[in-house]
Amino acid sequence: MADDYLVRIGKLIRDARQHRGWTQSQLAEALGTSQSAVNRIERGNQNISLEMIARIGEALDSEIVSLGYAGPMHLRVVGGRRLSGSIDVKTSKNACVALLCATLLNKGRTVLRRVARIEEVYRLLEVLGSIGVRTRWINDGVDLEIVPPAQLDMEAIDAEAARRTRSIIMFLGPLLHRMDQFKLPYAGGCDLGTRTIEPHMIALRRFGLDIAATEGLYHARVDRSVSPARPIVLTERGDTVTENALLAAARHDGVTVIRNASSNYMVQDLCFFLEALGVRVEGIGTTTLTVHGVPTIDVDVDYSPSEDPVEAMSLLAAAVVTESELTVRRVPIEFLEIELAVLEEMGLDHDRTAEYFADNGRTRLVDLTVRPSKLEAPIDKIHPMPFPGLNIDNVPFFAAIAASAQGKTLIHDWVYDNRAIYLTDLNRLGGRLQLLDPHRVLVEGPTRWRAAEMMCPPALRPAVVVLLAMMAADGTSVLRNVYVINRGYEDLAERLNSLGAQIEIFRDI
């Protein structure tokens, strides 16, 4: 039990340090100790006194623990409050994790601007650090610098961190250019049913990659005599599948054509980044990508990921569900046009500014103002489609929006095996959602939300939807174990509080 306690304390200290934007060396200097001692503390391999915990908390401006048992993070939500004001959309979580994987292609220094400080990014940084990549937060913890070693140490990979993120699968594309064989832990992430790497392998086998899965590890081998002689046709127009194919093609010495490619926002951001690395990519924004690879990439690059359309949709949904007037700034409009068209059909009162460019110089942004509206259920069902259709990740938000509208709305979440089931958690808060089958939910509105205490759904977007409903419900709700939300959103509770919400973060004591 004592060892388990030290591990939990160590993780809390590590998270607080990363949130502050400090390295282990910086914390060690503030404490007057060594970096190796801080490393042992964070790994749970060092006995630590309450006095030292207090000193660390003071140095990091964070209460590491209160007296009692340290446990997962929870949210206490006082609902029924209107939001107001304006808020900027953060950079894309899905783009940032793809770009972090893409830095493995480059021998030079990479700086990524305004990187989302979320658990998914932290886990990837832990994995990168464990194999020898030097990363540090710069410019007051806003930007991220990545410098790779001459040789990666894959034997030292942090398997625990790797298994807590699905993004680790995107190491396959870059690593096949750096070594002839390697091992990679099984990917984890949020629980969205059975996932398979076969769509990835259909693309990556064309570059000579072969994988055997044994004992929780992918054992990868690369046959250098194999290369794609004809276009690669993806059997699944998935985002990470397309990204893996792009990462493999980037350092292939030749031209690679990828068909049935995703043209979603994070794929486009990755293409823009590859162009900054000197890789020419034709067809960006279409389903056919032509990649002119280069065998060696050794450049110092500075890149600004674009804003996150799914976070923008989250904030728009927060305004709708709480019947608030809210301005959401820096919205990547190209990736929300279908969603806004559906909301307009439902009766949403909103306006938008003229378009302007994101810091990457390519993505089109607008500022959106949403006002309280009397919504009607849409005539057609809500269902996702590959871009430019309604984004898969935005489907859950329509459950809360439909529950606020007059009438019945059919939501068909055909992509995932069980995400629709998690949406029925809204019934605990007064919703009227009927699960027709594992993929279809019938939502009846409007809803008089009521407060409740419940566990956080294990899938990211449904978890946020539950939080939004709690914000609309009169009374005090508790959402327990919100790690999955922290995987995809930076300081969401604090940012919603800045708009008028009342959300308290706490841990069991």
Language model segments and positions:
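Short, structured segments at the rim of ligand-binding sites
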Residues: 15-16, 35-43, 47-59, 63-509
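Short basic helix-loop element that most often maps to the first helix and adjoining turn
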Residues: 11-30, 55
